Amino acid sequence: MVSTHLTSTTLPDCYRSLIVNSELGSSALMDLNSPSFLYPLLHTPADKGTLCTYQAALGKVYASLEVIGVGDDKLQAVHGLNGGKPHRDILGSRITRPTGIKPLCLPRHILAYDWLAQSLLGIVIGSISLAYNELLMMEKLKGFRPFVPHIPFDFYLCEMAFPRVKPAPDETSFSEALLKRNQDLAPNSAEQQIEEVRQVGSYKKGTMTTGHNVADLVVILKILPTFLTMLTNETGFEISSSDATVKILITTVPPNLRKLDPELHLDIKVLQSALAAIRHARWFEENASQSTVKVLIRLLKDLRIRFPGFEPLTPWILDLLGHYAVMNNPTRQPLALNVAYRRCLQILAAGLFLPGSVGITDPCESGNFRVHTVMTLEQQDMVCYTAQTLVRILSHGGFRKILGQEGDASYLASEISTWDGVIVTPSEKAYEKPPEKKEGEEEEENTEEPPQGEEEESMETQE
């Protein structure tokens, strides 16, 4: 008959280990405290306190007993952690140092079956290994605080929880002002001089020959072509006239990025930026072709130009923000333009683009990259407090001033203003940039401590 017995032994620093006494033919004692048995699991003696705790191992044994069909009545007979009561909640991520743990003895009616005893022996040893791996992981993560982003308040995501006590205000004039501003910003047919860009020649036909690697592009204009100037830069070149500019960006296929020679080829960041622009255009065409989204983005670009606090917002961030404000709601139906415009300012004011916020994930990048992390902490704060001021002005009827229909309004974000007897005080910045270290201080620090890397300190948040 095969019998299995589990008991406890005392280790330095009050740690517990397991002794597995297996009578298989000849009696053999396997003490988990012995270096010969610990080496495959620990690679170090057990006296350093790295052995998995008795609590975690027993928790897995209890779970294993339940898996193989041992009922609650039989588990009551298993002496263990909670005065003989079965434990099912010891499999969590918390592993603590055990105190006052009783020995574990499997009941005789369980040990009456050879197959069950052998299974339990394997379960115990396997559980010890798993528990130890969990403990090692916890030791590595000790003191590490995982990043858990917060979700800023968005009224339109929880509108049902805040029922109105008054009828919705009439915003017809606000909607008309938005449409009027969009009409002023949209280029007319005369300004849109490019009709089409076509690939032609042997490249388009697929009849190119060796030694004549030339691709022909034809730009069809709506106007009479005049003499143009060409300006080369690090990203490609620009063809411009007094009224319009065409930018030509150069890149390569993604597999070639690993083969670039810095002394021979273009900067990899330039090539990656052009590839990203292609992904952005493709995503926008597939997901943001709704007319309200396009109008809102045009208005946001105008807002960025007229208010310095919004300058850090890149065109791609504005694209995603406009799409989010119009389409991301419980009904999955596009919101009205006036509602979406107000929502943009509200969620920016609530901290959508602050360091701890969930923000907006870039749909064209891998790894859950939050688009606002391209901004510095100072810029993120500036966007937030500028939006807070404009939200208060908008709430008191100052939309014409915000839209630029009543002259320059850039001062509103930094000066006190009055709207229908209500005084609006601009929000103040919450982030203070750390003082820059002097050259002498940096040299002293370098002499005291050896450098640990070549990376410069950056204010950009990292994922």
From Swiss-Prot:
<dbReference type="Pfam" id="PF07528">
    <property type="entry name" value="DZF_N"/>
</dbReference>
<dbReference type="GO" id="GO:1990904">
    <property type="term" value="C:ribonucleoprotein complex"/>
</dbReference>
<keyword id="KW-0805">Transcription regulation</keyword>
<feature type="modified residue" description="Asymmetric dimethylarginine; alternate">
    <location>
        <position position="94"/>
    </location>
</feature>
<keyword id="KW-0238">DNA-binding</keyword>
<keyword id="KW-0010">Activator</keyword>
<keyword id="KW-0804">Transcription</keyword>
<feature type="region of interest" description="Disordered">
    <location>
        <begin position="424"/>
        <end position="463"/>
    </location>
</feature>
<feature type="domain" description="DZF">
    <location>
        <begin position="108"/>
        <end position="444"/>
    </location>
</feature>
<keyword id="KW-0539">Nucleus</keyword>
<keyword id="KW-0963">Cytoplasm</keyword>
<feature type="modified residue" description="Phosphothreonine">
    <location>
        <position position="461"/>
    </location>
</feature>
<dbReference type="InterPro" id="IPR043519">
    <property type="entry name" value="NT_sf"/>
</dbReference>
<dbReference type="GO" id="GO:0005737">
    <property type="term" value="C:cytoplasm"/>
</dbReference>
<feature type="cross-link" description="Glycyl lysine isopeptide (Lys-Gly) (interchain with G-Cter in ubiquitin)">
    <location>
        <position position="166"/>
    </location>
</feature>
<feature type="cross-link" description="Glycyl lysine isopeptide (Lys-Gly) (interchain with G-Cter in SUMO2)">
    <location>
        <position position="259"/>
    </location>
</feature>
<dbReference type="InterPro" id="IPR049402">
    <property type="entry name" value="DZF_dom_C"/>
</dbReference>
<dbReference type="GO" id="GO:0003725">
    <property type="term" value="F:double-stranded RNA binding"/>
</dbReference>
<feature type="compositionally biased region" description="Basic and acidic residues">
    <location>
        <begin position="429"/>
        <end position="440"/>
    </location>
</feature>
<feature type="modified residue" description="Phosphoserine">
    <location>
        <position position="173"/>
    </location>
</feature>
<dbReference type="GO" id="GO:0005730">
    <property type="term" value="C:nucleolus"/>
</dbReference>
<dbReference type="InterPro" id="IPR006561">
    <property type="entry name" value="DZF_dom"/>
</dbReference>
<feature type="modified residue" description="Phosphoserine">
    <location>
        <position position="189"/>
    </location>
</feature>
<feature type="modified residue" description="Omega-N-methylarginine; alternate">
    <location>
        <position position="94"/>
    </location>
</feature>
<feature type="compositionally biased region" description="Acidic residues">
    <location>
        <begin position="441"/>
        <end position="463"/>
    </location>
</feature>
<feature type="modified residue" description="Omega-N-methylarginine">
    <location>
        <position position="145"/>
    </location>
</feature>
<keyword id="KW-0597">Phosphoprotein</keyword>
<dbReference type="GO" id="GO:0045893">
    <property type="term" value="P:positive regulation of DNA-templated transcription"/>
</dbReference>
<dbReference type="GO" id="GO:0005634">
    <property type="term" value="C:nucleus"/>
</dbReference>
<dbReference type="InterPro" id="IPR049401">
    <property type="entry name" value="DZF_dom_N"/>
</dbReference>
<dbReference type="Pfam" id="PF20965">
    <property type="entry name" value="DZF_C"/>
</dbReference>
<feature type="cross-link" description="Glycyl lysine isopeptide (Lys-Gly) (interchain with G-Cter in SUMO2)">
    <location>
        <position position="437"/>
    </location>
</feature>
<keyword id="KW-1017">Isopeptide bond</keyword>
<keyword id="KW-0488">Methylation</keyword>
<comment type="function">
    <text>Chromatin-interacting protein that forms a stable heterodimer with interleukin enhancer-binding factor 3/ILF3 and plays a role in several biological processes including transcription, innate immunity or cell growth. Essential for the efficient reshuttling of ILF3 (isoform 1 and isoform 2) into the nucleus. Together with ILF3, forms an RNA-binding complex that is required for mitotic progression and cytokinesis by regulating the expression of a cluster of mitotic genes. Mechanistically, competes with STAU1/STAU2-mediated mRNA decay.</text>
</comment>
<dbReference type="InterPro" id="IPR052134">
    <property type="entry name" value="ILF2"/>
</dbReference>
<dbReference type="GO" id="GO:0003677">
    <property type="term" value="F:DNA binding"/>
</dbReference>
<comment type="subunit">
    <text>Forms heterodimers with ILF3. ILF2-ILF3 heterodimers may also bind to PRKDC/XRCC7: this may stabilize the interaction of PRKDC/XRCC7 and the heterodimeric complex of G22P1/KU70 and XRCC5/KU80. Forms a complex with ILF3, YLPM1, KHDRBS1, RBMX, NCOA5 and PPP1CA. Identified in a IGF2BP1-dependent mRNP granule complex containing untranslated mRNAs. Interacts with IGF2BP1. Interacts with CRBN; this interaction promotes ubiquitination and subsequent degradation of ILF2.</text>
</comment>
<protein>
    <recommendedName>
        <fullName>Interleukin enhancer-binding factor 2</fullName>
    </recommendedName>
</protein>
<keyword id="KW-0832">Ubl conjugation</keyword>
